[in-house]
UniProtKB/Swiss-Prot annotation:
Gene3D superfamilies: NagB/RpiA/CoA transferase-like (3.40.50.10420). It comes from the Bacteria. SUPFAM superfamilies: NagB/RpiA/CoA transferase-like. Signal peptide: none annotated. Is involved in L-lactate degradation and allows cells to grow with lactate as the sole carbon source. This is Lactate utilization protein C. It comes from Bacillus cytotoxicus (strain DSM 22905 / CIP 110041 / 391-98 / NVH 391-98). One of its GO terms (biological process) is lactate metabolic process. Belongs to the LutC/YkgG family. It holds the Pfam family LUD_dom.
């Protein structure tokens, strides 16, 4: 990623001075670590094995995993919408909805059934936040999915802001199987590779592990304080 770095030399010189030595400007090599647990964990797992790890972890984070197919995804989502009280619904503006055959479902079918659906509009920041505040359900795709922790990774972009993921009462994440990786290591490595190729980094990257869970010093769990009360992962 191109950019201008200012005051780098003086900054590094000050650090070296505080360390009591001259600044090293050449011959510096990355250390060879004795253990590479970040690279070794789950590295030999197949896609199905990673999915099983993911599902097991989701049991620990109070998240419902629904395995489905592209053809059955719409019906699975519609059923969960009904079971969770219907709209209002806030949906990200993402081209993947078209790929998975969901565009007309959200833009036409649900509204025809008197279910309020709002699509994130990059030109209407304040209105998007109002929609998120009143939404019963927020729906978006996962960009990366971490098997080890049951975490979805979502990046802010024109078609979706942070409030879409945190303000609705219930959150639906659509997870393409190909987004499932062992752990955070692989997700961050891919992001870094994209940046090195010149892609702009997202203004905000959120790692979301199930619904909002908070606990006080007495270990009393409270759900929904900092985000959705319930989370559903649709693995396609």
């Amino acid at each position: 990623m191109a950019g201008t770095i200012q005051n780098r030399d003086s900054f590094l010189d000050n650090i070296a001075k505080e360390l009591g030595r001259a600044r090293k400007t050449e011959g510096v090599q990355r250390p060879v670590w004795k253990n590479n647990v970040n690279l070794e964990t789950l590295k030999d797992c197949s896609e199905e094995e990673l999915l099983e790890v993911f599902k097991k972890q989701c049991e620990n984070i109070h998240t419902t995993v629904i395995e489905t197919t592209k053809d059955e995804l719409k019906d699975a989502i519609q059923q969960m919408i009904a079971e969770n009280g219907g709209g209002p619904i806030l949906v990200s503006d993402d081209e993947r909805f078209e790929k998975y055959g969901l565009t007309s479902f959200f833009r036409e079918e649900l509204p025809s059934q008197n279910v309020e659906v709002n699509i994130w509009d990059p030109e209407e920041k304040d209105e998007n936040i109002r929609f998120a505040e009143k939404a019963n359900i927020g729906i978006a795709f996962s960009d990366y999915t971490l098997a080890e922790s049951g975490t979805i990774v979502v990046q802010s972009r024109k078609g979706q802001g942070r409030s879409l993921h945190f303000l609705p009462t219930v959150y639906f994440s659509i997870i393409p199987r190909e987004t499932i990786v062992p752990r955070i290591t692989q997700a961050v490595r891919d992001m870094n590779a994209r940046v090195e190729k010149g892609e702009a980094v997202a203004s905000c990257i959120n790692f979301i592990t199930g619904p909002s869970n908070s606990a006080d010093i007495e270990m009393n769990l409270v759900v929904g304080v900092h985000g959705p009360l319930k989370a559903y992962y649709f693995v396609v």
